[in-house]
Amino acid sequence: MNILRASQLNNGGNMSNNTNNNMNSNMNGNMNNLNNRNVGNNRNIGNTRDVSNNIDTGRLQINVTSAITSFPVADATISISYTGVPDATLEQLRTNSSGQTETIELDAPPVELSLNPNNEIQPYSEYTLNVTAPGFEPISISGTEILANETALQHITMNPSEPDETGEEVFVIPGHTLYEEYPPKIPEPEIKPVRETGEIVLSRVVVPEFIVVHDGTPNDTTARNYYVRYRDYIKNVASSEIYATWPANTIRANVLAIMSFTLNRVYTEWYRNQGYDFTITSSTAFDHKWIPERNIYTNISLIVDELFSNYLSRPNVRQPILTQYCDGNRVSCPGWMTQWGSKALGDQGYSAIEILRYFYGDNMYINTAEEISGIPSSWPGYVLSQGSTGDKVRQVQEQLAVISGAYPAIPRVTADGVYGPATAEAVREFQSVFGLPETGTIDYRTWYKISEIYVGVSRIAELV
């Protein structure tokens, strides 16, 4: 793994001291000008500091994989610049054998800005990433969002290059829903009637492996459909709808609402029953905001991995509840959860279910899906660790052996059904590569992450 600072770049990428100083001066000046507006009106953020001259930092890690094989892309080069100054490189990173860069720190606006519902200043900084790799088409992502004190994860998929092709794929990430203006949600009944003859409805609640996202309004025939892994979709939506700086239980409550809404669309086949060929849209007027190639955040990712098989229920109702919400500041929505209101309750120590019941009523419950699609075997219900034995251990060892073929940093282990030090080390390295707590034990999150990566890697291997 290599990381080149701006001052170390070779010919063609050098940044002079004057350029560096000018950029720092410009950013400081812009922050000062922005922060001098309306800071005096900030409230509900506790004991605050003076943010008018303050710049915080956030963190960024980049993961690069092949769009065809899902294997990591080693030795990819990523040049990072401010989105507003795209030609002046701040950092240049290279991916390791796992397709990952080092985690770096980048300037971000003060954390207080993302904690105040009355703030009018953009609370995140935006960066442009230009990515190249031998044998792949270059890709540019403009608008990666860095929040103070949080780690942003930017997943990038690269297409193999074709002969005589010199084009660059470009993604421009629009602003966050809590900062930019988006259409408010059109109200719908939270429980969908299922009466029409021939209507497609699932017999039980199933967590899908993939969903089809229509990147526009339902009737926009020019919008593209994307096949997205369910968990990746939820992480993307949560990162687009709320700020990762918010309390953990606030994030959990919002993730549960997002998942229940989404699983209602899956369970009722809402759009397919209207003749469409997708599961859900990216329009805030109809569904949630989902953005192709946007970054997510480590804490949101871990919470989704913790909760992804859950949804919200009411007594004697089989389908997941269509839990609608709004920001609660620019838009009001009686009877729905408000995002800023959920943040205030999280600040007061409310649990996730307490937050949800505050908005949706006391008869709202957290339920678990009967089936998770696309996995070889369900979670055994207990943590696997050194000393564990049996078929579940052997199964994980076999899966890790397959995964290590694509991710050589993960040591290959013998599938003997005994969870010894070698297995613990392989699990620990797997957790390091995929952003999980490095415990060396297999809990719920690690079990399903191993299953997800194994299915992706082995499915491609079968096709080769």
Question: Where are the regions that the model predicts?
Answer:
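Structural motif
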Residues: 55-57, 61-74, 83-85
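Short, solvent-exposed loop/turn segments that connect beta-strands within catalytic domains
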Residues: 84-88, 122, 405-409
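Short consensus segments that form the blades of beta-propeller domains
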Residues: 53, 69, 118-120
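Short, acidic Ser/Thr/Gly-rich low-complexity loop/linker segments typical of extracellular
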Residues: 85-115
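Conserved, single-site charged/polar hotspot
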Residues: 1-55, 75-77, 94, 100-106, ...
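Short loop/turn segments at connectors of secondary-structure elements within structured domains
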Residues: 56, 72-74, 89, 125, ...
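A short, solvent-exposed loop/turn motif at the edges and junctions
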Residues: 111-142
